[in-house]
């Protein structure tokens, strides 16, 4: 056992425990990416321009809080370590605010907008408070780089599993739990997600351990750290690239439900083994997003080999271009070309899915 600890070999149970943290997080992140616009315009009922501004403001604010939270977490000292405690301390507030975010209050428009700004920015702050330390935990879970790579792979598998769960089940679940009341369905769905998230975060907290101690270095202030970041050109380039990528993912995902609801509508489709059936926009959207998640997972597997041969930067640029073109081409298709729409989704997701992996690896 001492030899195992010395070389940093982790049990499979601990590797799985870490992955549960991303399973919890992506239930929310994938919802924001796929259904943000639809929820706020068609369920919450605020103007699209207000919803778009809300998203933009929160993204800019999030870029600031991410940096600050990283500095705070790095200075945290507890008996549980630097990073694990945040999973314990904030999982319940995160779940509660998640329910409030997807609650539609009986307010006038101004009151609704205030509610939306407060709750959405608060859920994003809590997301940052949990996920910045959670991501950093990967670096201290083992001194063995091969073990950390394995844990990272499991983390991405859990993330894509959560993406598939959201894509396949969220819209049907809101219908089922709402009993005809769409707003109530969203609120109850996030009660379910919230309970699941608490359990998953606690599994990640309980099942992992911080083993790599940070070296004692000269203490610096947050102000000094920020000054060094601002003058760091590679960091600035990576930040702009990350913002561009997130905006692409957000726009691509957020218009999907509206596209199927108002452009595609209900379709009669002939499928092998299922015959000819009629599908409404909820089923088509869920199928479209699920196909995208599976394609993204396959893309992540493929890019791990391609990046070694052609380079991470080259593959990122190539895949980003293909993803953008595949997404743009959908505009030129009609509702009757549903098969081609799904094929472009496969191409766009196969190349778009691995972008986050390549981005973090550069």
Q: At which residue positions do the language-model features occur?
A:
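Membrane-embedded alpha-helical bundles of multi-pass transporters/translocases
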Residues: 2-362
């Amino acid at each position: 056992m001492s030899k195992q600890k010395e070389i940093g070999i982790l049990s499979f149970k601990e590797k799985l425990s870490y992955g549960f943290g991303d399973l919890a997080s992506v239930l929310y992140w994938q919802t924001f990416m796929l259904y943000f616009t639809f929820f706020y315009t068609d369920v919450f009922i605020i103007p699209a321009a207000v919803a778009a501004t809300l998203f933009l403001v929160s993204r800019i604010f999030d870029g600031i809080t991410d940096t600050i939270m990283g500095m705070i977490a790095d200075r945290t000292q507890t008996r549980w370590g630097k990073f694990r405690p945040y999973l314990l301390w904030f999982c319940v507030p995160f779940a509660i605010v998640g329910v409030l975010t997807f609650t539609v209050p009986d307010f006038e428009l101004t009151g609704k907008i205030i509610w939306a700004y407060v709750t959405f920015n608060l859920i994003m702050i809590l997301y940052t408070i949990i996920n910045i330390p959670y991501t950093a935990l990967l670096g201290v879970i083992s001194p063995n780089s091969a073990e950390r790579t394995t844990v990272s792979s499991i983390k991405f598998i859990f993330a894509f599993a959560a993406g598939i769960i959201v894509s396949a089940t969220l819209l049907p679940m809101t219908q089922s739990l709402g009993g005809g009341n769409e707003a109530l369905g969203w609120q109850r769905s996030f009660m379910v997600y919230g309970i699941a998230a608490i359990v998953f975060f606690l599994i990640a907290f309980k099942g992992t351990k911080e083993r790599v101690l940070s070296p004692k270095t000269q203490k610096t202030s947050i102000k000094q750290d920020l000054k060094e970041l601002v003058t760091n050109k590679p960091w600035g380039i990576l930040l702009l690239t990350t913002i561009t990528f997130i905006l692409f993912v957000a726009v691509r995902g957020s218009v999907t439900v509206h596209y199927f609801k108002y452009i595609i509508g209900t379709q009669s489709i002939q499928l092998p083994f299922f015959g000819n059936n009629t599908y409404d926009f909820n089923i088509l959207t869920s199928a479209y997003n699920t196909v995208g998640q599976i394609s993204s997972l396959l893309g992540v597997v493929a890019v791990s080999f391609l990046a070694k041969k052609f380079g991470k930067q080259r593959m990122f640029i190539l895949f980003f271009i293909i993803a953008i073109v595949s997404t743009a081409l959908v505009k030129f298709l009609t509702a009757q070309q549903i098969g081609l729409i799904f094929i472009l989704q496969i191409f766009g997701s196969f190349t778009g899915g691995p972008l986050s992996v390549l981005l973090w690896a550069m």
